[in-house]
Amino acid sequence: MKESLPKALKELRLSGMAQSLEVRLQEAAGNGLTHQEFLELILQDELLVRNERQMQRRVKAATFRELRTLEDFDWQFNPSIQKKQIFDLATCRFLEKGQDVCWLGPPGTGKSHLCQAIGYQAIKAGFTVRHSQGSRVFSLGRRPKALN
C-alpha cells in the first residue's frame, strides 16, 4: 500500500498531496495528529500547489513583457505620478465595477511598468488579465469603451 498511495494520488492529479505525503506522514506520526488534522494539512498542500500553478498560468496568459510590481517601481523617477491613485487602482475595485483604465502619456514615463504591475495585482486577486500595448489594440480594430 505504501507505493500504491503516491501512484493513486498522481493518477487522481493530486500532485501537491503526492509531493508532501511523506513529510506529512512523518509529521503526523511525530506530533500525534488526528486523521482530520492530517487530512487538512495535505489538502492545504494540494490547494497551495494548485493556486501557484493557476497563478503561473494566468501570468503567462497575460503576455506581460516582464513581470513588474509596484514594489519595483521607482517613484522618484516621475514625481508627477499620483501614488495614491495608483494604489487605488491596485485594489482592483475598478474591475469589480466593470470600469476601464486608459494610460496616456509620453514614452518613458512609467505607464507600461505601472500597467503591468496593476495587471499582476489583478491576477493575484483572481482576475484574468491580458496585457497589450495601445498601438497593438488599435491596430487590431479594438477600441476602449471610453473612445466608442
Question: Which positions does each model-derived feature cover?
Answer:
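Short hinge/gating elements
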Residues: 7, 23-27, 72, 101-104
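Short glycine-rich substrate-engagement loop in P-loop NTPases that contacts/grips substrate
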Residues: 80-86, 130-148
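Phosphate-binding P-loop
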Residues: 89-99
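Walker A/P-loop
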Residues: 93, 102-129
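Dynamic helix-loop-helix/coil hinge segments at AAA+ ATPase domain boundaries and subdomain interfaces
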Residues: 8, 60-82
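Interdomain "pre-motor" coupling segment immediately N-terminal to P-loop NTPase/helicase cores
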Residues: 10, 15-66
